[in-house]
Amino acid sequence: MKDTSKLDAKERIINASIKLFSQKGCDATRVNEIADEAGVTKALIYYYFKSKEEILDHLVQSLLDSAASIAMDFLREIFMQMIKEGQMKMEEGRLRFANQEAVEYFLQSAHKYIEQLLDFALENRAIIRILTLESLKGDKHQSKLFQMLKLGEDAPILKTISQGEGEFYYTDDLKLFLFFFSIIPLVSFAAYFDDYQEISSLSDSEMRSSFVRSVQIVLNSLISESSYLMHNAIKTRP
């Protein structure tokens, strides 16, 4: 039987760290402050984590793993399934659809995915704020932010798509677009959500709806060109 008191203590340590790191940053937060906030001893913190930096690593990696899982679900359940069913294919660096119904289904599914990813980001906005703060310092967590692209040879996203469309690679243009026009807007929206809400007086639902509409406008405009931002962006290897 698990010791629930210890599990609760670890969760309190993590939650206290999230609160303090998001307010002050990791460097400015002392271990004894985490202990006081969590209602535990410093010794218990060191029982679970070697240092406050290890707590930070745990928070960031858990966030990235969960985000990658959401992306992979969309790829497997929608992207790859449509390819297998012949409703969509990649041709000359573009997404081609079999008919208008396929386009509408893809857009509808993509919109649901965007909302799911947005809800995840907002639920974890304190951790995203921490990641943003730490990445600006130029330390290892800057590379963590770039890891969200997952563009290496062993990247699960690339492997998954390659199963249906053959081997291909991302060009520099697509990498830049994905980072600055896809990942960064979502990260920034989550990180500054509370600050913007304070000066705008918008409700949670109003801000969320406005962001979703903005993303949908961009997505719809790309699809209307019969291209999903892949023209001259993703090329088949020779």
How should these model regions be labeled?
Residues L59-S109:
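Amphipathic alpha-helical linker/stalk segments
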Residues S62, I130-E134, F181, P185:
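Short acidic/histidine-centered micro-motifs embedded in hydrophobic/aromatic stretches
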Residues R12, A16-Q23, I70, I130, ...:
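Solvent-exposed, amphipathic alpha-helical segments
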Residues R12, A16, L20-S66, E77:
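Helix-turn-helix
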Residues R12, K112, I130, F177-F181:
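Amphipathic alpha-helical interaction segments
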Residues M1-D8, K19, D73-K84, M230-P238:
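N-terminal intrinsically disordered/low-complexity leader segments
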